[in-house]
A protein has these predicted regions:
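Gly/serine-rich nucleotide phosphate-binding loop at the start of the catalytic core
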Residues: 2-108
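Positively charged, helix-rich recognition surfaces that bind polyanionic ligands
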Residues: 3-7, 30-33, 40, 191-428
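Well-ordered beta-strand positions in beta-sheet-rich domains
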Residues: 33-35, 165, 183, 212
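Stable alpha-helical structural segments in soluble proteins, enriched in small hydrophobic residues
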Residues: 60-63, 109-122, 377-387
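Surface-exposed helix-capping loop/turn segments at secondary-structure junctions
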Residues: 68, 123-127, 334-336
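Acidic carboxylate diad motif detector
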Residues: 78-189, 317
Length: 428
């Protein structure tokens, strides 16, 4: 039976949401990953966690099976209270009916998340983005938790729906006097089970450095700054990873064997280990750049196209693409400026302005005017030069447009929002 909310309840919800939105303006979002301790939790806890993800898969597949043609019309009528018994298939593809024992909070959140995903797919399809048909899930590795049902008990224990006291590692990261848990997710990885917490912290004023820097992406030196500081973000495959890949290839004919399953599990765990190292290096480089410069300039290099070249393997083993995307997110806050990739940052001399041809094997830029500098450092300095010039032109052009649109007799630039929109529109 559908619950009908009274007008008083709707007004309370609306007022609470408005209060939350006002509070979020003075807060900053941080995500912390807590690992469920393997040594200090009984085996029954992990059996229950495994069962939660198994039943979450059954619930999602039950939602998708409501319509034979996989249309999403009847999925929105799905009520978790009316589907306590679901039909799934065993390894021999025989239908089996099972009763859902998943905690109601996780059950409701799984259903709501799937409906939200379908709405987002519909919006993407309306924008012209190609989306495929809805397909059944072979596994589910993330279960959302409704806000308000996750609490930190002490320095090493938390409580989530279905688990009154869960021993986790990583709570030492949350050592703040004021914080608010906004969201939580239960995640399964190759290395174990995790609880990801989205924490809202009070904003602290940032001390400006009054410095700008240009970045140059390359192969030998992955990142070079205009201050001649280099970063290496390449992480090669480990020998153990290569060994496991060979072992998995040997057992490719034994598709259902336990030996192949164990090898796949070890290989996934090693891939996650290498990915974590790459992610750690990316975050450290990003933090160093953001804390050193107020504005970062870089070219819009197509890192994806570099994968098709003879040095593509080195690019794939680095985190250049992820780091570039993370820096581009600073464009909205005017802390990053992206230049066109066609600007001659490597060929142009910053002293006389001459454009000289230079080969890939030449590591030092030399001009007839006597200017000489290492290739990557020279490119980063030119990126900074082009960036400051183009940014000044964009600000001047956008300011002129805003001034022409203002009524006569008005003073100052009170229309700050149109100025910012015009600045973003005139970026290269």
């Amino acid at each position: 039976m559908e619950t009908v909310r009274s007008e008083n309840t709707k007004a309370k919800i609306k007022a609470s949401m408005a209060e939350t939105h006002a509070r979020r303006k003075s807060q900053i979002c941080r995500v912390f990953e807590l690992k469920v301790s393997i040594r200090h939790n009984p085996k029954s806890v992990f059996d229950k966690l495994s069962n939660c993800f198994r039943e979450a898969k059954w619930i999602i597949n039950d939602m998708l099976s409501l319509s034979k043609d996989n249309s999403d019309n009847s999925i929105f009528d799905y009520k978790y209270t009316d589907h306590k018994n679901v039909v799934h298939f065993d390894k021999d593809k025989n239908p089996v009916t099972s009763t859902i024992t998943l905690p109601s909070v996780l059950h409701r959140a799984t259903v709501a998340q799937k409906k939200t995903d379908i709405v987002n797919l519909s919006k993407a399809k309306a924008k012209g983005i190609k989306v495929g048909a809805l397909k059944f899930k072979s596994e589910v590795n993330c279960i959302p938790i409704i806000t308000g049902f996750t609490k930190i008990l002490d320095a090493s224990h938390i409580t989530i729906p279905g688990f009154r006291k869960l021993k986790v590692n990583g709570l030492h990261q949350i050592e703040f006097e004021e914080y608010e848990i906004a969201d939580a997710k239960l995640v399964r990885k190759a290395s174990g089970y995790y609880v990801k917490l989205t924490i809202m912290l009070p904003k602290t004023p940032r001390t400006p450095t009054y410095r700008s820097g240009g970045l140059d992406f390359g192969i030998k030196n992955t990142i070079t700054t205009s201050d001649n500081k280099t970063y290496d973000c390449k992480v090669q495959e480990t020998e153990y990873l290569k060994y496991l890949s060979k072992m998995l290839n040997r057992h490719k004919t034994e598709k259902d064997s336990k030996r192949r399953w164990n090898c796949r599990k070890q290989l996934a765990r090693e891939h996650e280990h290498v990915a974590n190292i790459r992610k750690d290096i990316r975050n450290k480089i990003y933090h160093d750049l953001v804390s050193s410069y107020d504005v970062i300039y870089m070219q819009d290099e197509q890192i994806k196209n570099w994968h098709q070249t003879w040095f593509g393997k080195q690019v794939q083993h680095s985190c250049m693409g992820a780091l570039k995307q993370k820096i581009k997110m600073l464009v909205k806050s005017d802390r990053a400026f992206v230049l066109s990739k066609w600007l001659p940052t490597t060929k142009m001399c910053p002293v006389c302005g001459t454009v000289n041809a230079i080969g890939l094997d030449e590591r030092t830029y030399q001009c007839d005017c006597g200017y000489s500098k290492p290739r990557d450092w020279h490119s980063a300095c030119n990126v900074l030069l082009f960036g400051t010039t183009k940014r000044a032109e964009c600000v001047e052009h956008a300011s002129a447009e805003v001034a022409s649109s203002m009524p006569s007799g008005s003073t100052g630039f009170a229309q700050a929002a149109p100025l910012k929109r015009n600045l973003e529109a005139h970026r290269l």
